[in-house]
Every structure is written in structure tokens, then in C-alpha cells.
Amino acid sequence: MDVRPVEEDARGIIDPATGLARFRLDRHPPSPALARFVDRHWVATWDLTGREPFTQRVLAHPVVNLVFTDGTATVHGPAAGPVGRRLDGRGWALGVMFRPAGFRSFADRPLHALIDTSLPAGEALPGGEELERAVRDLDPGDPDAVAPLLARVEDFLAALAPADPHPAEGTRDIVERVAADPTALGVADLAAREGLGVRLLQRRFADHVGPGPKSVIRRYRFYEAAERARRGTPPDWGRLAVELGFSDQAHLTREFTAVIGVPPGRYAARARAGR
């Protein structure tokens, strides 16, 4: 599986240049046994000793993350909007980022029940108490604890992974096709392209992904707009708005500002200044 470094793919990280001056983010591919379900493992490390705490805002992918930090193991469901993570002192976090719909093969509930929800691993995964015990006594300031923990997490998930195909894997493929081409596409267009009725598509997303298809399409459009904004020469915002399915530049600017916090032009200028 292709896992690109954050410098090449910062989708979901709001104002990455500012954040990456304060923490390091490494990405690792999953083992072959987990590649059907897991997109990547990520490791964040920081040392802000003697510096102001920093809150990194993210517009997370429409997926589940299993996160280990500060002695806890927590399953974070898909977030409906931006969320912030406060960093202070010295620390690390290990995350398992599942593929879209990938967590459904492990879960005992539809994923719409996990939107904007965080649960201890023991409540969200069969036998997840083992993961809570694995991280409980680790030094939260020692990044050397991450590698053996990651190996243990991989073994745990591989043992839990179903051998037979799960219906969610078809929905995963639909979402990943949207992610690869987030241009102008409505829910009805997507349903027709996939040979599904709109209501069936919506039910599959609610069960397997969490957010509905409209929200997922919108999320990937924002990623594309933010990535275009931070790279090289600022884009033609009017043309980009039409390409990504917004009615006009004003619509893109209004939606972008509501989600990201600043207009796209200002976001682009900030990104260029941070390089």
C-alpha cells in the first residue's frame, strides 16, 4: 500500500506547516494481514518543553482511528467537523488509521453510532482490554515505547481480523474511488456510477462508514481545496470551485471558511509563508 509522507499528502491536517514545526509525524504501512482494513499507522512525537502548548486542528478522514497516548487506548469514530489535539511537554501518540469502512469488520455496531464518539478500546473491540493493558504502564514521554507497542497492536488486530470478505469492503472501495477523484459528483451521480439506488447507498454508508455519502464527498472536496491552496501558485479559485462541485467561488469561500476557519486565499498565503 502506498503511504505517502506528510509533506506530500497533508490531507486532514489544518495548517500543516505550523503544526509540523512543533511535532513530527511519521507514517508506516500496515502488515499484509491488515492491509484490507488499515490504511496506515501514524506516530506523532513532540517536545515542547519550555514552549507554549500547541493545539493542532484536524479535519479528519471519514474513518476510525485507534489511538494510544498518555497511557490510554481509545477508538475515535469519524468526526463530523474539525477537532483539536492539545500538545504540551514531551510526548507521543500512536494511531491506527483504518481504511474507510475498514473498522466495520471488527465492530459489533453500525459505524454511524460512532460519529463524534470516543470509546475505550475495551468497549469498542472484542478483547480490547488487552490493548488498554499494553499501553497503561508505558512512559508517555518516551518515544522508544512506540515500536514494541505497534508490533503488539498489529498482532492483536491480525488475530481479530475476519478471514472471509465483509460487505463493508465493497463500500470501502466506493469511498476510496471518491477520495481519488473528488471532482463535481453528487450523491445521485455516485449511486448511478456504482449501480446502486440512492437509499441503498445511504444505508451502506451509515452502516459501514458512518457519515453519509454527501458528507464524505464534501470532506474530500475540502481536502482537495486545502491541498491546492498550500501547494505552489495559488489556484484559480473560481475554476476550482466549479471543478469541485461548488456553485461558484463565493460558495467555495463561504464553505471553506466555515470549516477551516479562514478564507482559502488567506489559508494559501499562510501556507506559503510557512514553507
Annotate each PLM feature.
Residues M1-V198, H208-P213, E227-R231, D236-S247, ...:
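Alpha-helical bundle regulatory/interaction domains
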Residues E224, H251-L252, A258:
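Hydrophobic side chains within alpha-helical segments
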Residues F205, I217, E255-T257, A268:
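DNA major-groove recognition helix of helix-turn-helix
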